[in-house]
Amino acid sequence: PKQYAPPPASLREAVQVPFQEFFQRRSIGPALAVLAFMALYKLGDNMATALASPFYLEMQFTPTQIGLVAKHAALWPSIIGGLLGALIIVKIGLNRALWIFGFIQLTTIFGYVWLSNAGPDLVILAVVIAGEYLGVGLGTAAFIAFIAREASRLAVATQLAMFTALAALPR
């Protein structure tokens, strides 16, 4: 791979310079708007994921059922969502994909309302989790593409680390 700049000579150069570079590329208002978007885009999914296990237990699913159904129903839909998301982004563009996938992430969370009304049904649990994680995969593909677009080639590793850490804060 082509190296665009020499490696940083110090920790300050590795962290502070990429941070400053991000704000120097745009004025403070747009830079803060981009950072706010990064912090908020996955907020709903992060909160739903954090509350999922306590919700399943309250719904009277056993830990074994949660482990078997929830974990298996999440893996493949999230992988498929990520791959499908990448293909769709190439086809329709990143900005449209961010909106569409954000809406999908929002609507799939309502599957928990269906599950709550249906009661402890393992099939509905699997369908709800699969739908949510398909949306998670789509949204994550768009989000990663967005932060990659916003990162500078001169400081890509540090900026990607900072941006993903910012998005993970609500967890």
Predicted features by range, described:
Residues 2-33:
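Juxtamembrane intracellular "pre-TM" segments in multi-pass secondary transporters
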Residues 27-48, 130:
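Pair of pore-lining "gating" transmembrane helices in MFS-fold secondary transporters
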Residues 50-67:
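Short amphipathic helix-loop junctions that connect adjacent transmembrane helices
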Residues 53, 57, 144-152:
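Helix-terminus/helix-capping segments at the ends of transmembrane helices and short amphipathic helices
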Residues 80-99:
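Helix-to-loop junctions at the C-terminal end of transmembrane segments
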Residues 96-146:
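C-terminal transmembrane helical hairpin of 12-TM major facilitator-type secondary transporters
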Residues 153-171:
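A late C-terminal transmembrane helix in Major Facilitator Superfamily
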